Amino acid sequence: MAAALICGATVFTACSSNEDNNTSQGGTAQIIGRWTADVTGATETLWGDGKALRMTELSSDGTGSTDIYYLLNEDIAVGRSHQTFRYTASADGQLTMTIDGNKATETATWSMTDGRLTLQTNGQSLTLQKTDAVTEKRIIEWNAEGDLISVPAPARYTVFVYGNAGGTMDEIIEYGLWERLKPLLTDESNVRVICFYKYGKDLPQKPFTGKFTDPGDILWFELNSQTDFSKLKTAGLQSLGFKQEAQDMKLCDPATLRMFMRYSSLFCPAKNYVFTIWGHGNGFSAITDVPGKYYTSETSTTRGVIGDEWNEDEQLDMYELSYAIRSLSQRPFDNIYFHNCLMGNLETLTELRNVTEYITCSAHTLCSNGEILTEYIRGLMEKGNTPEAVDLMFKRTDDVWKPLYLEESILENSAPYNGDMKLLRTDRIDPILEATKRLAERLVAQYPTQQEAIDRATTSVYRFFTHPFIYFQQAMFDLADYAHKVANETGDAEFAAIATDIDAAFSNAFVRYEDVNWNTEQFLPHYTLSVCLFDHETYHIDIMNRFKGLNPLCNINDGYEQTTFHQMTGWGKWLDTNQKNPRGNPTSGGGKLLTR
């Protein structure tokens, strides 16, 4: 089933040569032979929860090969990488290998202890033992199967594009990302892109617009210069006879996400991984934020990354995303790129700070036709690192991306929308949390004597998005703006010091950012990240009984106090203390309508 799901993928071929006309002199007799080691979790794939077995053969004529077998259940091989080389070895423990194909040279030291061969290079060591008869038999059987995934040499980057945006928006990923990127992806050793996309429902009011396949179908393919879009449909799950399975497959299930990343990494392994979400983001929602949706032993979920309209808009949560990455890789991803709305909230980002080095996100609703993600990936190809790629992304899209917010305002007959997009380093989030903890503690301590001033700040802080009907949904407010509003209204020196520290922490964490300000009445000169803000009554409202139509899993306070963000900052204690409902605040899309 997994092999069938790699629909539309380019046929992968081994990235090494099998030239056998080697004349290099081999090493000492001690190291000649076939050697085996368990390298589970130490490869450049995301096969961390499966076994990986390495077999290296060193021949007496100075030639050698290394195969890595990727296994299920210890004895079922799924994929194999193959590399051949020439080598020289000296009696004093020096080993030099020249890789066939790319001619790269690797050096190591070798030693023998109790019949085991240890190789050391770049501060890392690997101990191999002579391949026994049982393993030899298994390897022969695995190679005879003939349908193993051929795992190529790792690229510099593999970018995962995972999503579902709905039938009215499917065309955006088609022309806004796939068609734009296709001619650029020519070098498999540099950046590879692999997509998993579920097409939306055919809405009667807005006919289905997808041109590559049918509603509910799932496409799983590598995007490169050779991708034939006309053949995607024939490789989709529905065309393969799995129509109901495609519609029932939940994007929100971490098992689906893990399967996608796990098998994709065999076809497109990389030294660095980027995970991009393409879809609708709901930010953080405390009423659907409870532990144990799929894994009952785990805690701290933050829901709202991406929904699946074929499954009652069920949401993937941030813990499940974190779990999927941690279960597959011992090293963090390079970047998580949220190409969706409202994901620049601290409740969410706190959960992800240990599974990725960078996060790209917007605290506002995001306006994009795919140009920003396209240019980010193009920047990776040219610069080879995320910060410079994001810098190029902004430079190349500034005159196209920012006007989209104004166009959206006109289409919706709204006051002008604001926006933002930022890249932050996750290892610099903790100072933000530490300053937020001080702010929460100071708010609780000073509220009895300075309630009126703090209430003024609460009702004037900038809100990133205001739900048209339900005031406590997406109640996300700019943290730095709140700290400064409180300091200004109270005149308190400690609040002022905290606001200064929050500014410094954000400045240190943000590697690159752009703000979009079309609204000249309700805006901030610079946007940071959001936090939830409720009054005591709302924080404890009986949502389970009073708002059943929202399908809540818990009340706000129950969900909020299970987040890592609350556990590190105590922010929920302030929400429990605050008596002022922040309604009517300055917001994106607030104020006077555009002049036509």
Question: Model features per residue range: what roles?
Answer:
Residues T158-Y162, R192-Y197, Y273-I277, D334-F338, ...:
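Structural recognition of the beta-strand scaffold that forms the well-ordered cores
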Residues T168-I173, D202-K206, G283-I287, M343-T348, ...:
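Extracytoplasmic/secreted cell-surface and envelope-processing proteins
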Residues R262, L266, V290-R596:
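Terminal, contiguous helix-loop blocks that mediate binding/assembly
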Residues G8-D38, N122, T127-A153, T595:
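Bacterial Sec-dependent N-terminal signal peptides
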Residues M1-I6:
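Sec-dependent N-terminal signal peptides
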Residues A144-K271:
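N-terminal extension/subdomain marker
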Residues G41-W47, T63-S125:
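Contiguous, well-ordered beta-strand patches that form the walls/edges
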